[in-house]
């Protein structure tokens, strides 16, 4: 049997075998056996030394063709087997797109943030600026410009976290009002602002007190400002937060930075003023302090107190949230208990 005939038979025998191979490993073994250095085609090429000079090129070319044809068959089968592996994997990992997905919990603003955002939006609608200031504040702005000099007995009303003799953790957001009054150009219009933020006092933490809490103070300065302007503003704000049927009353009080000063009560939104545990059976709930800006505060900011006047108020968003949602422990706001916090999630 001549070499060409052997090569043809080799191709026919292995062509069928290759097409029936079931795995890539088995196919690789056949590749090595047929096309490797010890394979039959290599053996045929080595035997060409016994051929005549005329036969040698023909047989060599035919042997190379058979090797290329077998390589092509092997590559074709390899592609089929690889595709079969992919198809099997896809079949085993099929995703049913009609199945409901696992819900992803979305974040939501904290209840205090919601209250503050709501109040800020209300006052911005009335033309107020929202201005924030540093939490590490100068004694000068925190106390002295608020008519509370170093020897003033009112400093005993709130213990303060001092960093140095002149630097402290602000105990109120009023310092931003002082900073703004110093710079405001009243020839361009009145000053209307709120200053929300975190304040610090050396209180023992309990159900109604915290060493760190939120405050929002408001200030209006212009010519011809009266107590009626203050009352109308606070009535609109209380009706916005606690319900349109609410009324308010003003009781005389004392704050160093306002004169006259008042405590503001809102009619109880739980009992409608009839008396209940929330309002301690009085029909009224204390919600904030306010008053007309003290002339000394205006003068400290180089504002002519004979020409300009104004009103100021301060409220606690934490207290507003407690009252509005019936929460009896301020510490609940500062825990990571999702059972509590998710009750106030905003939808949409």
Swiss-Prot record:
Cofactor note: Binds 2 magnesium ions per tetramer.
Catalyzed reactions per annotation: tRNA(Phe) + L-phenylalanine + ATP = L-phenylalanyl-tRNA(Phe) + AMP + diphosphate + H(+)
Residue stretches spanning the membrane: none
UniProt keywords, alphabetically: Aminoacyl-tRNA synthetase, ATP-binding, Cytoplasm, Ligase, Magnesium, Metal-binding, Nucleotide-binding, Protein biosynthesis
A Gene Ontology cellular-component term: cytoplasm
GO MF entries: ATP binding; catalytic activity, acting on a protein; magnesium ion binding; phenylalanine-tRNA ligase activity; transferase activity; tRNA binding
Source organism, top-level taxon: Bacteria
Gene3D superfamilies xrefs: Bira Bifunctional Protein, Domain 2 (3.30.930.10)
Chain residues that bind Mg(2+): 259
Sections of the chain in a coiled coil: none
Top enzyme category: ligase
Pfam families in alphabetical order: Phe_tRNA-synt_N (PF02912), tRNA-synt_2d (PF01409)
GO biological process, one term: phenylalanyl-tRNA aminoacylation
NCBIfam families: pheS
Family, as annotated: Belongs to the class-II aminoacyl-tRNA synthetase family. Phe-tRNA synthetase alpha subunit type 1 subfamily.
Name assigned to this protein: Phenylalanine--tRNA ligase alpha subunit
């Amino acid at each position: 049997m001549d070499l060409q005939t052997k090569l043809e038979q080799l191709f026919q025998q292995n062509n069928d075998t290759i097409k029936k191979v079931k795995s890539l490993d088995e196919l690789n073994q056949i590749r090595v056996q047929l096309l490797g250095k010890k394979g039959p085609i290599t053996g045929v090429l080595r035997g060409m030394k016994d051929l005549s000079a005329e036969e040698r090129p023909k047989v060599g070319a035919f042997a190379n063709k058979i090797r290329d044809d077998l390589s092509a068959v092997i590559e074709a089968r390899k592609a089929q087997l690889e595709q079969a592996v992919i198809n099997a994997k896809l079949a085993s990992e099929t995703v049913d797109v009609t199945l409901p997905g696992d819900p992803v919990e979305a974040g939501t603003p904290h209840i205090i943030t919601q209250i503050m955002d709501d109040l800020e939006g209300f006052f911005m609608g009335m033309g107020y600026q929202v201005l924030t200031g540093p939490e590490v504040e100068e004694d000068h702005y925190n106390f002295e410009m608020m008519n509370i000099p170093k020897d003033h007995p009112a400093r005993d009303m709130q213990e303060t976290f001092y960093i140095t003799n002149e630097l402290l953790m602000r105990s109120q957001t009023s310092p931003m009002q002082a900073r703004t009054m110093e710079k405001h150009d009243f020839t361009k219009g009145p000053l209307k602002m709120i200053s929300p933020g975190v304040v610090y006092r050396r209180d023992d933490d309990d159900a109604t007190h915290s060493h760190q809490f939120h405050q929002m103070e408001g200030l209006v300065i212009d010519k011809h400002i009266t107590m009626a302007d203050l009352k109308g503003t606070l009535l609109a704000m209380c009706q916005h937060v606690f319900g349109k049927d609410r009324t308010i009353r003003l009781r005389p009080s004392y704050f160093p930075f306002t004169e006259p000063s008042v405590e503001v009560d809102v009619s109880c939104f739980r009992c409608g003023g009839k008396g209940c545990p929330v309002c301690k059976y009085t029909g009224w709930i204390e919600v904030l302090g306010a008053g007309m800006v003290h002339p000394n505060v205006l003068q400290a900011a180089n504002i002519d107190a004979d020409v300009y006047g104004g009103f100021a108020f301060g409220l606690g968003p934490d207290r507003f949230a407690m009252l509005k949602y019936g929460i009896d422990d301020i510490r609940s706001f500062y825990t990571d208990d999702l059972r509590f916090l998710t009750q106030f999630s905003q939808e949409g």
